């Protein structure tokens, strides 16, 4: 590795990170390299020079890289690195192959009922707090994923299976289901009733236990109907059991006592009723016991050469991902760049660890413990909320940890 020039070594550092081989501490200056003829600029005036002030493991202290916006275009290698980074954080091997879209009417209804967002006239989805920034209050708390799965039918289903859903656990076998519900639309047909009376029915939702033959469990609910509308049925137990078995297909049978005689029709998968297609909503959490220490960092403003955070926004339309990522419209691929002189690395709070602070104190006394140099790296990462389709056409709302660089420091 010592024989590699700074620009090649920096590019290798970026690609290894995107492939998941390096941790977030290596996310330093993830920007395209300059042309071979462009020498790195000298250290800023007044700052100590030499290798001690740069991060040789990541291709230099900011001098060996150029920002994407300075290139006048988004570099292909940079975009590919960002793509791999996002897919790895979503635990996806590749981008979902969206061959046929979920009917817009069904998606609009689901988002509206969940108060999750709205669809604009141009077809784009607006989701509160999903603007590409960090989700508020997400750091240090348990991460909650929301999964929306729409009902399907096929010729392989048994005579008893009315509906089935492919519910993904997003690659996590230890998800704990906080709540899961079936949303079912009950439609009222013309029927003569006494004035002020309601139609009272009992809806039974049977869910099949995989591996137990014809064994079914049931959830019952009495429903008083005055008009057509949506109703929810708790199926938390069924979804939790599904996740624990490592399976994805949920088979349901819906039966309604007195529905026929009272002219009540449960709407299943009907081409003429796409806006009323049944769907399942799952809220699951995966606890994170790690604690982060808040540190303050500089913002790159064009006037400082010290370690700072550079903001950079990538529109998903530019990389052709707006077909499977519903919201947000883009990603803040912020990164860290700049030099790390010894006096900055030794300031309490700017180092990422106690070990780093001790090493820097040795340096300042002239007792260098070896060829260990400071890097400008993220010291605070935050979560990002995303709403997207997975391979099974589930709509997934997920708080993805450690997605956005919030602050940078020297370590």
Curated annotation (Swiss-Prot):
InterPro entries found in the cross-reference section? Cystine-knot_cytokine, INHBB_C, TGF-b_C, TGF-b_propeptide, TGF-beta-rel, TGFb_CS
Q: What drives induction of this protein's expression? A: Increased expression in methimazole-induced goiter.
Which N-terminal residues, if any, form the signal peptide? 1-28
Keyword Secreted on entry: yes
Tissues where the protein occurs: Alpha- and beta-B subunits are the predominant forms found in rat testis. Also expressed in ovary.
Sites where a glycan is attached: 97
Q: How does it assemble?
A: Dimeric, linked by one or more disulfide bonds. Inhibin B is a dimer of alpha and beta-B. Activin B is a homodimer of beta-B. Activin AB is a dimer of beta-A and beta-B. Interacts with FST and FSTL3.
Gene3D superfamilies noted in UniProt: 2.60.120.970, Cystine-knot cytokines
Q: What does this protein do?
A: Inhibins and activins inhibit and activate, respectively, the secretion of follitropin by the pituitary gland. Inhibins/activins are involved in regulating a number of diverse functions such as hypothalamic and pituitary hormone secretion, gonadal hormone secretion, germ cell development and maturation, erythroid differentiation, insulin secretion, nerve cell survival, embryonic axial development or bone growth, depending on their subunit composition. Inhibins appear to oppose the functions of activins. Activin B is a dimer of alpha and beta-B that plays a role in several essential biological processes including embryonic development, stem cell maintenance and differentiation, haematopoiesis, cell proliferation and wound healing. Signals through type I receptor ACVR1C, abundantly expressed in pancreatic beta cells, and type II receptors like ACVR2A. Upon ligand binding, these receptors phosphorylate intracellular signaling mediators SMAD2 and SMAD3, which form a complex with SMAD4, translocate to the nucleus, and regulate gene expression.
Q: Which residues form the propeptide?
A: 29-296
- Where composition is biased (Pro residues), the residues are 30-47
SS bonds (residue pairs): 300-308, 307-376, 336-408, 340-410
Q: Which CDD domains match?
A: TGF_beta_INHBB (cd19405)
Tell me which family the UniProt entry assigns to this protein: Belongs to the TGF-beta family.
Pull one GO CC term from this UniProt entry.
extracellular space
Its recorded name reads Inhibin beta B chain
A single Gene Ontology MF term assigned here is: growth factor activity
Q: Does the keyword Glycoprotein apply?
A: yes
BP-aspect Gene Ontology terms? activin receptor signaling pathway; apoptotic signaling pathway; cellular response to calcium ion; cellular response to cAMP; cellular response to cholesterol; cellular response to insulin stimulus; cellular response to interleukin-1; cellular response to leptin stimulus
Disordered: annotated segments: 27-69
């Amino acid at each position: 590795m010592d024989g590699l020039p700074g620009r090649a070594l920096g590019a290798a550092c970026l690609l290894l990170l995107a492939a998941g081989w390096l941790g977030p501490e290596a996310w330093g200056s993830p920007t395209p390299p300059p042309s071979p003829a462009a020498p790195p600029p000298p250290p800023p005036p007044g700052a100590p020079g030499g290798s001690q002030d740069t991060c040789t493991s990541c291709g230099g202290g900011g001098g060996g890289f150029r920002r994407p916006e300075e290139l006048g275009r988004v570099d292909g290698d940079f975009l590919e690195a960002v793509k791999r980074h996002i897919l790895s954080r979503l635990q996806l091997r590749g981008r979902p192959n969206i061959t046929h879209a979920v009917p817009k009417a069904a998606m609009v209804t689901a988002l509206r009922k969940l108060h999750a967002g709205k669809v604009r006239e141009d077809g784009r989805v607006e989701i509160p707090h999903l603007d590409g920034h960090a989700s508020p209050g997400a750091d240090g708390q348990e991460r909650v994923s929301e999964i929306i799965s729409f009902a399907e039918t096929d010729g392989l289903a048994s005579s008893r299976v009315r509906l089935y859903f492919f519910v993904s656990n997003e690659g996590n076998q230890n998800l704990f289901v906080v709540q899961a519900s079936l949303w079912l639309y009950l439609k009222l047909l013309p029927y003569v009733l006494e004035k002020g009376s309601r139609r009272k029915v009992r809806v039974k939702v049977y869910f099949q236990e995989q591996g137990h033959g014809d064994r079914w469990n049931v959830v019952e609910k009495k429903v008083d109907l005055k008009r057509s509308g949506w109703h929810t049925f708790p199926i938390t137990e069924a979804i939790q059991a599904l996740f624990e078995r490592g399976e994805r297909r949920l088979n349901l049978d819906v039966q309604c006592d007195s529905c026929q005689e009272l002219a009540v029709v449960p709407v299943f998968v009907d081409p003429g009723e796409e806006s009323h297609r049944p769907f399942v909503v799952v809220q699951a959490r995966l606890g994170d016991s790690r604690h982060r220490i808040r540190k303050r960092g500089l913002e790159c403003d064009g006037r400082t050469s010290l370690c700072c955070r550079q903001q950079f926004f990538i529109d998903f339309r530019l990389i052709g991902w707006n077909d499977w990522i519903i919201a947000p419209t883009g990603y803040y691929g912020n990164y860290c760049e700049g030099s790390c002189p010894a006096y900055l690395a030794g300031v309490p709070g700017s180092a990422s660890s106690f070990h780093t602070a001790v090493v820097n104190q040795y340096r300042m006394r002239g007792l260098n413990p070896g060829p260990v140099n400071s890097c400008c790296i993220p010291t605070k990462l935050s979560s990002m909320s995303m709403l997207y389709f997975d391979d099974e056409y589930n709509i997934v709302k997920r708080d993805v940890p450690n997605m956005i660089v919030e602050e940078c420091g020297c370590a």
